[in-house]
């Protein structure tokens, strides 16, 4: 890239120097001499207004694309409302099909114990999906307090010009700094941070379970409905009523939607589960990856200062303190607060052990 740029800039600079030299000569036409002089004046004015010795080509590109960034951020902000409505409509359509189409069919074929199991599991799963999605949307992710000087800060935010605690990052869409920011989720129309990260992951997890349950449970009904739809164009045409045709198409829609969401959302859930097991957020993964490469080039090993071990990472993330909390705080709806305030973090055991060994020496 640099070689191509130098090949293009070399002839351009040579032509410009020739024009400047011609401008000094008296034989040069007055028109050309005036153009060269205006070029110099314009260059001086531009540099006096915009020149910065600390800036470079990257700064100029960022400044040029700032209107584009602003447009994208505002479009995503408004599209977040559309995505939230879309999630509610799609989820509501699946629930309506389950009650209006699936339930009348299984009432005639399933046994009473099997019906009871499906009844309790499906409603338990639905309650957890609705609860965690509502909490993820309405719960603020957490913002660093402004005007306080007693918080431990790592740096100053270049956008907010406020102290930025550890694991805090600026969201260009919300235009605020977010504590332990993971990402901005358009499907929530909200940032995923310290106080709603658990709700986001729990929604993804239980929504994946619900989609897998619907896809697997409706497999036989889907096959029958799909085979019936294939016979619509036969001669003579089958004698299906309007209600039966709607039921067939609804079952096919249910199976394809739940299967596709189970695959896509399941992959996202597994990815976030891996990050949680490592004690990282989505942003910290990229930061730690660069830091790991930098230290590896120096022959050193990078260790995540927020990794407490796989099990302890999950306990901190889910807010679990006792064995009973796995039932009351994970498998049942719970609005308990996460561990910590999102601004200061306890050091992991390996950091404490290293500090103790240094003090002993």
UniProtKB/Swiss-Prot annotation:
It comes from the Eukaryota. One of its GO terms (biological process) is telencephalon development. It is a multi-pass membrane protein. The active site is at residue 185. Residues 1-77, 138-198, 272-361 are cytoplasmic. GO terms for molecular function: palmitoyltransferase activity; protein-cysteine S-palmitoyltransferase activity. It catalyses: L-cysteinyl-[protein] + hexadecanoyl-CoA = S-hexadecanoyl-L-cysteinyl-[protein] + CoA. GO terms for cellular component: endoplasmic reticulum membrane. Residues 99-116, 220-250 are lumenal. Ubiquitously expressed. It holds the Pfam family DHHC. It is found in: Endoplasmic reticulum membrane. InterPro entries: Palmitoyltrfase_DHHC, PFA4/ZDH16/20/ERF2-like. The chain crosses the membrane at residues 78-98, 117-137, 199-219, 251-271. Residues 155-205 form the DHHC domain. Palmitoyl acyltransferase that mediates palmitoylation of proteins such as PLN and ZDHHC6. Required during embryonic heart development and cardiac function, possibly by mediating palmitoylation of PLN, thereby affecting PLN phosphorylation and homooligomerization. Also required for eye development. Palmitoylates ZDHHC6, affecting the quaternary assembly of ZDHHC6, its localization, stability and function. May play a role in DNA damage response. May be involved in apoptosis regulation. Involved in the proliferation of neural stem cells by regulating the FGF/ERK pathway. Interacts with ABL1. Interacts with COPS5. This is Palmitoyltransferase ZDHHC16. It comes from Mus musculus (Mouse).
């Amino acid at each position: 890239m640099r070689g191509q740029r130098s090949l293009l800039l070399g002839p351009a600079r040579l032509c410009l120097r020739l024009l400047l030299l011609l401008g000094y000569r008296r034989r040069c036409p007055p028109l050309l001499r005036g153009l060269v002089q205006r070029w110099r004046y314009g260059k001086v004015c531009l540099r006096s207004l915009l020149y910065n010795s600390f800036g470079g080509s990257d700064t100029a590109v960022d400044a040029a694309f700032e209107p584009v960034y602003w447009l994208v951020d505002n479009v995503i902000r408004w599209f977040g409302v559309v995505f939230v409505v879309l999630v509610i409509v799609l989820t509501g359509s699946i629930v309506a099909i389950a009650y209006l189409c699936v339930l009348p069919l299984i009432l005639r074929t399933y046994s009473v114990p099997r019906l009871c199991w499906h009844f309790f599991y499906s409603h338990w799963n639905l309650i957890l999906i609705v609860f965690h999605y509502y909490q993820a949307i309405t719960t603020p992710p957490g913002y660093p307090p402004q005007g306080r000087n007693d918080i431990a800060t790592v740096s100053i935010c270049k956008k907010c010009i406020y102290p930025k605690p550890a694991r805090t990052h600026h969201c260009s869409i919300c235009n605020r700094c977010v504590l332990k920011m993971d990402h901005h989720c358009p499907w929530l129309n909200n940032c995923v941070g310290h106080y709603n990260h658990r709700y986001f992951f729990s929604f993804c997890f239980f929504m994946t379970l619900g989609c897998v349950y619907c896809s697997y449970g409706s497999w036989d009904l889907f096959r029958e409905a799909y085979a019936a739809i294939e016979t619509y164009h036969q001669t003579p045409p089958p004698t299906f009523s309007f209600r039966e045709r709607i039921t067939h198409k609804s079952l096919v829609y249910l199976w394809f939607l739940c299967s596709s969401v189970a695959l896509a959302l399941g992959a996202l859930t597994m990815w976030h589960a891996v990050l949680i097991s490592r004690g990282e957020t989505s942003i910290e993964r990229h930061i730690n990856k660069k830091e790991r490469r930098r230290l590896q080039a120096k022959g050193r090993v990078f260790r995540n200062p927020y990794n407490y071990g796989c099990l302890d990472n999950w306990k901190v993330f889910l807010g679990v303190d006792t064995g009973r909390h796995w039932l009351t705080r994970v498998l049942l709806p719970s609005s308990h607060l996460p561990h910590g305030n999102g601004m200061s973090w306890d050091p992991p055991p390996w950091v404490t052990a290293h500090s103790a060994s240094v003090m002993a020496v």
